[in-house]
Amino acid sequence: MDLSVKSEANVEYMVEAIKEKLRMVNAGAMRAASFNEEMYEDLRDIYEHVMKRETFSISEMQAITEELGTLIKK
């Protein structure tokens, strides 16, 4: 998958991968359609960071979740 291309499919893929990797409890609250396309590069940066790591502390997971929250359409 070419994540350098801004598309809805790529947003969906990254959001689902992040949710799975972080084993998010409230994953239903985070839908790909909710993300602002203007923030695609920021989402991709978060995705790449999450995929590089094997484990996360609770505070890291909270920080990532908060950062994802800033990318959601208002």
UniProtKB/Swiss-Prot annotation:
Any Pfam family: DUF1128
Family indicated by similarity: Belongs to the UPF0435 family.
Protein name: UPF0435 protein BcerKBAB4_0386
Organism: Bacillus mycoides (strain KBAB4) (Bacillus weihenstephanensis)
